[in-house]
Amino acid sequence: MRDQAPLIHPTAVIDPSAQLASDVRVGAFSLIGADVHIGAGTEVGPHCSIHGPTRIGRNNRFIGHAAIGGEPQDKKYAGERTELVIGDDNVIREFVTINRGTRGGGGITTVGNDNWMLAYTHVAHDCHVGNHCVFSNNTTLAGHVTVGDYVIISGFAGAHQFCRIGAHAFLGMGALTNGDVPPFTMVGRESLGRPRGINSEGLKRRGFDAERITAIKRAYRTLYVAGLPLTDAKLQLAEQAKSSDDVRGMLEFIEAAERSLLR
């Protein structure tokens, strides 16, 4: 069903059950499958495929050859109903793949608002991506990865399954992480990424003042430079968190870890 006739190229294939807002644009040779909902102002470029169940919000751009809402790349998947939900104002570039969830991972993959996913990015099943993130070319997220707001992942970088990447973190080009990355932390390019300080420049651009950045740097030194066991580091962070909401957020992230922390 459609509100009115959207701006659809005559070579595009739209399933009768798909619901497109009246101003949605669909380019040449694109496929919109069953149980797909696309919100107002969204543009689907040429040669894209969007499979359901998938819910897409407003003002998104799928540039070309993107494969969205496909079956999860998980051998345990047996055709059960799972879904993908994408928010508003995202830019999805060429050959990006975003898969639906799996029953074992909660049944849903989510992408928030105002994210940029550049060419050949892969977001696997059951991932949860926040808002205002930038994934450079060939970023790869394995299954069940959680990414906070304002995260930047450079080209050819990736995250192991079940990892969490905290808000405002930065993964350098080619960085690979097999552990949780605390908020604000930069990860370098090694065989397995290692912490390389605080993303100070990014924080300045987002309006963090000197006092906030100083508190975050102090927390980073406590966690990574002081040589403390994690238990002792968390005790010191708890004291620092009394005067810093940012440090409190770091500590809450660490306390919620279900796998190893990147150290």
UniProtKB/Swiss-Prot annotation:
List the CDD domains.
Answer: LbH_UDP-GlcNAc_AT
GO CC list: cytoplasm; membrane
- Answer whether the UniProt record assigns the keyword Ribonucleoprotein to this protein: no
Main location per UniProt? cytoplasm
What keywords are assigned to this protein? Answer: Acyltransferase, Cytoplasm, Lipid A biosynthesis, Lipid biosynthesis, Lipid metabolism, Repeat, Transferase
The family line of this record is:
Belongs to the transferase hexapeptide repeat family. LpxA subfamily.
- How does this chain assemble? Homotrimer.
Write down what this protein is called: Acyl-[acyl-carrier-protein]--UDP-N-acetylglucosamine O-acyltransferase
What species does this protein belong to? Xanthomonas oryzae pv. oryzae (strain KACC10331 / KXO85)
